[in-house]
């Protein structure tokens, strides 16, 4: 394993030094018009290099362990090539467009500056003085409105960004859900099923939270519009009736209280948004833990498969060794039988020789027959000797095969022990992962409780917003009634003033007539 990894690293270094990739964008110039684009391109190059390093460095070892990776490796490299080409072409086009825009922008600025220099300075001064007076006159009326508009614009921008982020997270959750469903078809794990079910439940809860957040944002926007209308209405009242300012200050304090309530509601909404972002981070970390656990389970399954294959090989070697041992025992028994038969033949030959030597003198005619029997026995002895040598050579071959099988068996046992150690380590790691998953599940339950509390708080906030809306409507009705009374009093005062003016005019005319007479 170490030699294979070292060879793969050497091959990767050679390939990186030679730059064997024909699709690499060597001729591309570094963009000078955008610093952000240059930094992103450098990061993209580093990431693509790292991805290719991961693909090519471990390709040999992974191909030995799994043929599927070896089949998908060229497809992955092709995808990286297409991605890299598209990104570099887009970057080049963006660089050209940004350069053209900068040139056009500088030319427009120069033309505008020339036009502004040619205009007289007196008009500028008069305009500035008039605008300054108008700003001083309207500053007391528009400070609160401008501040509220600015804060509402910032809040709306933040809410739109948050809504976009929520939509992106929903899409990511759907993609991860599809990936997990595809992986679940090939992997049977109860923990993964539970985690997938929890992720779906969290996705539904996230959708509900998004809907509630949107409802709260709509209500807050309506309240802001009502406040702006009230404030504009207050400015009209202030210009139309200065005598009732003391009575309307109380209503302004009420409006300030409503505004503070709305700000408190916005703070609660921002806290809920922060907790929602924290919840999204937790779901992302849970997905990462799930992917790591699945990779560990797949590795453990592959190791178990290799362990089973090695165990089968070891069983076959053991069976073969037992059969060879039985054959050796049979041959040894046969050799012992041959040796005993040879000893018996030798004893018979000696007995026959003694009998021949004794019978030569006594029975001369039977000498030829005895010599023939002796020659036959010698031939049989030579044949038995040849059989004995053949059996000894066969026993030597069997012993050599036995030694080879024992060495293979020792190597297989060492490999099995190593695989068992690795499987034990993986089991421990899986146990740790399961404990961590349990902790994350517990944390998810706590987050669920927190989400329930936030839902209750959101319902309370909706009720509070409804109450503020009702109070705002009541305040508007009170303002309308006050304006009606003010208009009636103004009409009454105008009628009295007209009557008084007529009486005074009549007296003046009578005095003139008397003086003339």
Swiss-Prot record:
Coiled-coil positions: 156-486
Residue span(s) of domain NAB: 21-101
Residue spans of biased composition, Basic residues class: 10-21
Region Disordered: start-end pairs: 1-29, 101-159
PROSITE patterns per the UniProt record, alphabetical: NAB
Biased composition, class Basic and acidic residues, residue ranges: 121-135
Tagged with keyword Cell inner membrane: no
Keyword entries, A-Z: Coiled coil
Short name of one Pfam family: KIP1
GO molecular function, one term: actin binding
Biased composition (Low complexity): 107-119
Highest taxon of source: Eukaryota
GO CC, one annotated term: membrane
Purpose of the protein: Plant-specific actin binding protein. May be part of a membrane-cytoskeletal adapter complex.
Family: Belongs to the NET family.
Protein name per Swiss-Prot or TrEMBL: Protein NETWORKED 4B
Source organism: Arabidopsis thaliana (Mouse-ear cress)
Top-level taxonomy: Eukaryota, Viridiplantae, Streptophyta, Embryophyta, Tracheophyta
